[in-house]
């Protein structure tokens, strides 16, 4: 059976751990060559090296996506390594923990620079490259933006994060409509609470764990591999008529309008 991304090149940001790394590993299994990008050099280079030892074609490229010049360098390095980009996953993100009255402008700007502006800057750069590839005879590519259930919900203690994710949802729609004439598909994924290093401390606090699970109908946290499966679908041919959508991987949280009992 042919691998769904055989011969494709994928670029994934924020990919040294968690959901980003799970997507890299899934794309490798799907047959893609991958640019693994992160601002954490030790973790990113280490993960790329480990994957290469298993036979994968993975290159690490440092990038702090808050810096547009570093995004330019990331694109240049990706094209130097593989000559093309067929799939982009904008995944890099940070989270703030201040309430609305306490949030300072510097933090607000930093969160939006990474969680939203970089998705536009890199998304535009990759889309331009994809258009050039199409003109040269290649098939259209796919862009995937990592949103969150919090593009739907308001979190008073994560104001900048919530604002950024709401922006990602709308950016995804705007990009999808703008790029549809070229056949480039743009979609988003909206994870709920996924077991990653980012929330490791949260899920070990029993009170917090119970509160989260009380509003999660499936009664458990998600796994990074489950998000990666959606990223695989959106990158491949099986989603060829899907664009402008946000697919939520949240255990049923968004449609919930009640809390459920939690065992234990």
Cite the ranges covered by each PLM segment.
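Substrate-binding pocket helix/loop in short-chain dehydrogenase/reductase
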Residues: 99-100, 104-112, 212
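Active-site loop immediately N-terminal to the catalytic Tyr-X3-Lys motif
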Residues: 101, 153-159, 181-182, 219, ...
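Active-site helix of classical SDR
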Residues: 123, 164, 172
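Alpha-helical segment proximal to the catalytic Tyr-Lys
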Residues: 128, 177-181, 240
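Residue(s) in the substrate-gating loop at a strand-loop-helix junction
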Residues: 148
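C-terminal helical subdomain
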Residues: 170, 188, 207-238, 242, ...
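Short C-terminal tail/terminal secondary-structure segment
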Residues: 232, 243-264
């Amino acid at each position: 059976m042919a691998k769904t991304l055989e011969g494709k090149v994928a670029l994934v940001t924020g990919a040294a751990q968690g959901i980003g790394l799970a997507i890299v590993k899934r794309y490798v299994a799907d047959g893609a060559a991958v640019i693994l990008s992160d601002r954490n050099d030790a973790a990113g280079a280490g993960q790329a090296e480990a994957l290469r030892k298993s036979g994968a074609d993975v290159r690490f490229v440092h990038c702090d996506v808050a810096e547009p010049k570093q995004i330019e360098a990331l694109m240049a390095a990706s094209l130097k390594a593989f000559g093309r980009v067929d799939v982009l996953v904008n995944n890099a993100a940070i989270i703030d923990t201040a309430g609305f009255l306490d949030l300072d402008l510097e933090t607000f700007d930093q969160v939006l620079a990474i969680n939203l502006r970089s998705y536009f800057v890199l998304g535009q750069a990759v889309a331009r490259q994809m258009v050039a590839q199409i003109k040269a005879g290649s098939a259209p590519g796919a862009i995937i933006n990592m949103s969150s259930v919090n593009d739907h919900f308001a979190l008073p203690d994560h104001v900048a994060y919530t604002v950024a994710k709401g922006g990602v949802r709308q950016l995804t729609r705007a990009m999808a409509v703008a790029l549809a004439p070229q056949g480039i598909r743009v979609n988003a994924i909206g994870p709920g609470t996924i077991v990653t290093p980012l929330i490791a401390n949260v899920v070990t606090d029993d009170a917090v764990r119970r509160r989260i699970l009380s509003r999660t109908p499936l009664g458990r946290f998600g796994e990074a591999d489950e998000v990666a499966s959606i990223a695989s679908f959106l990158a491949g041919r099986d989603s060829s008529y899907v664009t402008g959508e946000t697919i939520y991987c949240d255990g049923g949280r968004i449609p919930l309008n009640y809390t459920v009992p939690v065992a234990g």
